[in-house]
């Protein structure tokens, strides 16, 4: 009687899970099928886990670990507020990198002789370590535990980054030279260097993210997501796991594409975002002419009540105030008042890719009403009222009017072209780019100061009276 080939069954399972990953990713491209796509991808991962258990020596131990980890993840997912999703995404990226980091570490400890496979092990640990510590740094920045760092810390971080990358390159080079016989090192010495390498990869991740400002966090999170996928793919190669390779490649490629798209939407290079920042991009000392024109909630209501077309532009201020539900309520009231309502969404508004989309989706705002700059800017001059809720740099006219501005050339939502602009803001503070916003001083601009949720609630109350 022939023995059943469990290895073949395992490979078939991996191929099936890879197909589910790809199909699920395809479904995520449409708002109507995104939820189903998420479930399809989740089922693909469950299938990959189950077939992996086929040749595990102690499946009970693995199932226990899965149960504990899954329970913790479920609790986090159920308890997290929608406004804290960026922090959660950063943590998930970090734990993905940490998994690859530990897997490669374990594989190194199992190796008794020096081989070229060690180069993959080193690469996996380096990328996984950067992803983990960099994601932790991003998490604390998003949580506002870490504020903007000093020039000294930024300068020190750059040198630490250079040192970490150089040390990693030398460690990988010495493995290649050792295998080729050009530089023979004892295994004990290599293990000592390896411990230093473990620490250096974590320090490099911190040095990479610490100097980056909060305004660039969406791009940072996207890149860290890509790195977590690359680390997973490398880990899959090390342990010859097909599902891990496919999943890692999908995450790595999609994350990198998204990173490039977001950088383009800011009209900046990745080098400028990660190694220069806004401060070195130019000067914003030009004197702004005009004066601030405050408006009360009662007067603001009269303006928007008479409007036939309104554009709502959400920003990080809406997320902080958790105002997405009252924003949706205001939009519904305006539509009931025979007003055309749309939402202007800038790709880098908020603190993560799609931050505003997530918040508005939670409030059940129709995806069809969400417009990007290229879609709404040509029609901006016929918009009666543009309501800017906690957005700053993404509506700053300096990007188009001041060649010396740090954000000059960045595509923005050109709300200053609307007939009336109503800006909801706590204070006159600048955005993360540190650039004063001439929009606030425009003749057609009115400032409604205060908490965004409270201000919009007052407008809603006026409509209901």
Predicted feature locations:
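Transmembrane alpha-helix boundary signature
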Residues: 52-63, 75-86, 101-115, 175-183
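Transmembrane helix-loop junctions at the membrane interface of multipass transporters and ion channels
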Residues: 105-113, 176-188, 219, 226-247
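Cytoplasmic-side transmembrane-helix entry/capping segments in multi-pass membrane proteins
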Residues: 35-44, 62-65, 84-97, 150-161, ...
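Hydrophobic core segments of alpha-helical transmembrane domains in multi-pass membrane transport
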Residues: 14-25, 45-52, 67-76, 103, ...
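Membrane-interfacial segments at transmembrane helix termini in multi-pass membrane proteins
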Residues: 250-307
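C-terminal ends of transmembrane helices
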Residues: 20-35, 70-89, 135-150, 204-217, ...
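Structured cytosolic domains appended to multi-pass membrane proteins
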Residues: 288-465
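Structural signature of hydrophobic alpha-helical transmembrane segments
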Residues: 4-18, 55-71, 117-132, 187-200
């Amino acid at each position: 009687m022939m023995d059943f080939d469990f290895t073949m069954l395992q490979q078939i399972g991996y191929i099936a899970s890879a197909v589910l990953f790809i199909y699920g990713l395809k479904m995520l491209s449409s708002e109507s099928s995104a939820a189903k796509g998420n479930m399809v991808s989740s089922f693909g991962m469950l299938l990959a886990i189950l077939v992996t258990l086929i040749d595990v020596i102690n499946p009970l131990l693995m199932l226990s670990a899965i149960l504990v980890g899954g329970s913790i993840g479920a609790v986090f997912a159920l308890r997290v507020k929608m406004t804290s999703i960026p922090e959660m995404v950063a943590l998930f990226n970090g734990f993905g990198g940490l998994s690859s980091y530990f897997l490669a570490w374990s594989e190194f400890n199992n190796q008794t002789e020096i081989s070229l496979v060690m180069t993959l092990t080193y690469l996996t640990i380096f990328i996984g370590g950067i992803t983990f510590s960099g994601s932790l740094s991003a998490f604390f920045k998003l949580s506002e535990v870490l504020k903007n760092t000093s020039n000294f810390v930024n300068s020190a971080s750059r040198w630490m980054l250079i040192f970490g990358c150089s040390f990693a390159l030398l460690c990988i080079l010495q493995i290649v030279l050792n295998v080729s016989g050009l530089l023979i090192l004892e295994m004990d010495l290599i293990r000592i260097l390896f411990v230093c390498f473990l620490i250096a990869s974590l320090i490099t991740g911190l040095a990479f993210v610490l100097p980056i400002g909060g305004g660039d966090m969406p791009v940072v999170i996207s890149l860290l997501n890509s790195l977590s996928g690359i680390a997973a793919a490398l880990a899959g190669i090390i342990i010859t796991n097909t599902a891990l390779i496919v999943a890692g490649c999908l995450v790595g490629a999609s994350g990198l594409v998204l990173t490039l798209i977001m950088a383009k939407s800011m009209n900046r290079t990745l080098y400028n975002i990660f190694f220069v920042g806004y401060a070195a991009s130019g000067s914003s000392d030009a004197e702004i002419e005009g004066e601030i024109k405050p408006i009360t909630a009662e007067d603001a209501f009269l303006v928007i009540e008479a409007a036939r077309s309104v554009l709502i532009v959400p920003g990080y201020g809406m997320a902080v105030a958790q105002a997405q539900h009252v924003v949706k309520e205001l939009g519904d009231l305006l539509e009931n008042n025979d007003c055309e309502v749309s939402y202007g969404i800038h790709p880098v508004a908020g603190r993560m890719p799609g931050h505003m989309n997530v918040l508005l989706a939670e409030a059940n705002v129709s995806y069809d009403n969400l417009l990007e700059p290229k879609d709404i800017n040509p029609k901006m001059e016929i918009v009666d009222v543009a309501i800017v809720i906690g957005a700053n740099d993404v509506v700053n006219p300096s990007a188009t009017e001041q060649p010396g501005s740090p954000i000059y050339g960045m595509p923005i939502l050109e709300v200053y072209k609307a007939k009336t602009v109503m800006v909801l803001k706590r204070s006159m503070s600048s955005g993360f780019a540190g650039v004063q916003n001439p929009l606030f001083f425009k003749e057609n601009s009115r400032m409604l100061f205060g908490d965004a949720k409270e201000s919009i609630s007052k407008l809603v109350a006026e409509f209901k009276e």
